[in-house]
Regions:
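Charged, alpha-helix-forming regions
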Residues: 1-255
């Protein structure tokens, strides 16, 4: 036979292990520095990752993950505990605790909240009304959709995402929305108040995010939206294997 024997798996040398450790320490220091800078300089998301008001944006690392699923609306959402989220890049590890998020609604609500928050210093409260949110999402203006919007905001807030990658290092327990509450509920002055997690903003830093035209994006079906997330987050996308795409959608259909 022409095939050579399989090489023995390489053990990491002491030097390589030390190099890994140094790299980890550097990553942690850089992350700490970025977060301290955000605080000290009162930076906004827009300072780190600008996008136009007719656009919305998303960190590439989340665009390529199965964080927002495309499962059937009739299928009840799963409650997930330290659930490993599929990611296109093997280098990225994401675990998720919370109620399953869907591309159909949660993804859009989150992107719109980032839009509202983008010009405020990270970590300061941002207010908007359910009327504004539903209008910007292209949703009907009625109580049912206000309730739907509130459910999405609550789900997004009740999340714990652990993230690690070679580029960023480790993020411990990031929430997609750091704080959410409804002020003056039931009154004419009622509004939502949210804060964005500074750890979340780190995912955007260094130009690692994608921008897209909102009017077109929000009209896409959930599956088309996830396909778009993949392609928009790669400058030169690899052809996408169907199985990889299925996993990226968090789909549980066998086909």
């Amino acid at each position: 036979s022409m095939s050579a024997p399989a090489p023995a798996p390489k053990r990491k040398t002491a030097v390589e292990k030390t190099a890994d450790k140094v790299s980890e320490v550097k990553q942690a220091a850089l992350l700490k520095h970025t977060k301290e800078q955000i605080k000290a300089m009162q930076l906004s998301l827009f300072d780190l990752a600008p996008w136009g008001d007719d656009m919305r944006a998303m960190p590439n690392d989340l665009a390529r993950a199965a964080l927002f699923t495309t499962r059937n609306k009739k299928t009840p959402r799963e409650v997930r505990q330290q659930h490993v989220i599929f990611h296109v890049n093997k280098d990225v590890l994401i675990t998720y605790t919370g109620i399953e998020l869907r591309a159909d609604d949660d993804e859009l609500v989150w992107q719109q909240v980032l839009e509202y928050a983008k010009r405020s210093p990270v970590g300061t409260p941002v207010s908007f009304t359910f009327y504004e949110l539903c209008t910007d999402l292209g949703w009907p203006i009625n109580g049912r959709y206000y309730d739907k919007a509130e459910e999405c905001l609550t789900r997004l807030q009740a999340t714990a995402v652990q993230f690690s990658s070679g580029r960023i290092g480790r993020l411990e327990s990031v929430s997609l929305i750091h704080r959410f509450r409804v002020l003056d509920r039931g009154k004419k002055t009622s509004r939502c108040q949210v804060e964005i997690d500074e750890e979340m903003v780190v995912l955007f830093a260094g130009d690692h995010y994608s921008k897209f035209v909102w009017e077109k994006y929000r009209e896409l079906s959930p599956t088309a939206r996830r396909m778009f997330d993949y392609f928009v987050s790669h400058k030169e996308p690899f052809p996408l294997k169907l199985e990889t795409f299925r996993l990226m959608c968090g789909s549980d259909s066998a086909r």
